[in-house]
């Protein structure tokens, strides 16, 4: 955040944040409302939600949804972290793919026919068409997402400028901490769910406000969220489904339904299920997203009705600082998408999916807390934060 503000000299900072489930196909550690508080306390001025139909998706769809929301908010500049760290290389890579599109698509198909996952096939295809050092390594997860951000900006004819900050010391999937006080989300999650879990172990790797809110969430609700807590619901659901039922679920393709139903029979945990399920053709993240769609019962028809090839249909406002509120007041007449301060009266296919995802997310809570949280989510107004006093209003 500090580096972004230093690099862009921004007037205000806007964060587009996933809701209950994340792009890598797992539940968010804490609710979006607590994560909104974390973002505001760390200097973000506006926090808006990326709908489930875009957030629990491959990088291309995720990026298209996020950029469309930022475009609607008239953002002038985007900043993202990457392994490469040179924004010119992202533009060069997008240009190279466009110039070699026919060859690229042929190579992707060729590598997939050889049994590789789409992600691996894409990475290999890029290696064949990219010869210059002024291109990015498309095997790296943050580079891939950054590439899709640039591609989305160009495809949506946006005037938005892009900047990138090089990630160092810790990689996206690193599972251990280093001695430079920088940690990946993966390593932090692993620590929080370890047998000897302690918030003190992660305090030097995250902002003080974030650590405090994490501890508060666990104290108030008795849990942090991960896949294992949903496994019994997930397994029961699969036990009641036929292969034909599974075929209707989004991202269940090419006979994957048979493998899923076979492997669930002998799995006693989500991790053991995933270990049994994964193949060379399907990445862990791709399979986790498919499992999330099974858990939330998100069908191909529902995603089709959400029309994800287009822009996000609304902007769900989760939180704002005083500065963010002033920005919205000045620009609301220019913003063409509806801004939702709650979802109680709004209707859209994308929001139908969102409501289901929220219901599932809170399903691990005990009653009456579960019902209270779900009801509150639809009526919850944006969190307001006074940055001058560092207090929530």
From Swiss-Prot:
It comes from Bacillus cereus (strain ZK / E33L). Coiled coil: none annotated. The gene is tmcAL. It catalyses: cytidine(34) in elongator tRNA(Met) + acetate + ATP = N(4)-acetylcytidine(34) in elongator tRNA(Met) + AMP + diphosphate. The keyword Transmembrane does not apply. This is tRNA(Met) cytidine acetate ligase. Its EC number is 6.3.4.-. One of its GO terms (molecular function) is tRNA binding. One of its GO terms (biological process) is tRNA modification. It is found in: Cytoplasm. Keywords: ATP-binding, Cytoplasm, Ligase, Nucleotide-binding, RNA-binding, tRNA processing, tRNA-binding. The keyword Metal-binding does not apply. Belongs to the TmcAL family. It comes from the Bacteria. PANTHER family: TRNA(MET) CYTIDINE ACETATE LIGASE. It is an enzyme of class 6 (ligase). Pfam families: HIGH_NTase1. GO terms for cellular component: cytoplasm. Catalyzes the formation of N(4)-acetylcytidine (ac(4)C) at the wobble position of elongator tRNA(Met), using acetate and ATP as substrates. First activates an acetate ion to form acetyladenylate (Ac-AMP) and then transfers the acetyl group to tRNA to form ac(4)C34. ATP binds at residues 81, 142, 167.
């Amino acid at each position: 955040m500090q580096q972004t503000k230093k690099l862009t000299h921004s007037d205000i900072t806007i964060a587009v944040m996933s809701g209950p489930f994340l792009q890598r196909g797992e539940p968010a550690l804490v609710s979006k409302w607590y994560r909104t508080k974390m973002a505001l306390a760390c200097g973000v001025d506006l926090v808006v939600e990326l709908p489930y139909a875009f957030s629990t998706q491959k990088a291309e769809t995720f990026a298209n949804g996020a950029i469309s929301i930022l475009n609607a908010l008239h953002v002038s500049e985007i900043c993202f972290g990457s392994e490469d760290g040179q924004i010119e290389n992202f533009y060069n890579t997008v240009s190279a793919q466009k110039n070699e599109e026919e060859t690229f698509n042929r190579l992707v198909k060729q590598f997939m026919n050889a049994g590789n996952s789409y992600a691996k096939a894409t990475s290999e295809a890029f290696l064949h068409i990219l010869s210059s050092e002024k291109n990015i390594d498309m095997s790296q997860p943050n580079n891939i997402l950054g590439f899709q951000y640039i591609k989305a900006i160009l495809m949506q004819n946006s005037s938005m400028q892009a900047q990138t900050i090089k990630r160092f010391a810790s990689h996206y999937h690193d599972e251990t901490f280093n001695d430079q006080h920088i940690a990946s989300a993966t390593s932090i999650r692993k620590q929080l769910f370890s047998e000897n879990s302690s918030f003190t172990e992660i305090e030097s790797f995250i902002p003080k406000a974030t650590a405090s809110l994490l501890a508060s969430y666990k104290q108030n609700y008795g849990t942090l969220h991960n896949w294992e807590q949903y496994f019994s619901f997930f397994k029961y659901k699969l036990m009641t489904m036929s292969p034909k039922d599974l075929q209707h679920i989004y991202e269940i393709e090419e006979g994957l339904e048979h493998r899923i139903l076979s492997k669930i029979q002998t799995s006693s945990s989500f991790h053991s299920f995933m270990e049994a399920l994964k193949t060379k053709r399907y990445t862990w993240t791709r399979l986790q997203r498919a499992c999330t769609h099974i858990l939330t019962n998100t069908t191909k028809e529902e995603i089709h009705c959400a029309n994800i090839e287009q822009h996000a249909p609304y902007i769900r406002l989760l939180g704002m600082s005083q500065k963010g509120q002033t920005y919205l007041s000045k620009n609301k007449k220019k913003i063409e998408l509806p801004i939702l301060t709650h979802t109680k009266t709004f209707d859209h296919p994308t929001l139908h999916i969102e409501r289901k995802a929220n219901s599932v997310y809170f399903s691990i809570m005990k009653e009456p807390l579960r019902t209270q949280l779900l009801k509150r989510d639809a009526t919850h107004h944006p969190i307001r934060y006074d940055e001058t006093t560092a207090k929530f209003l």
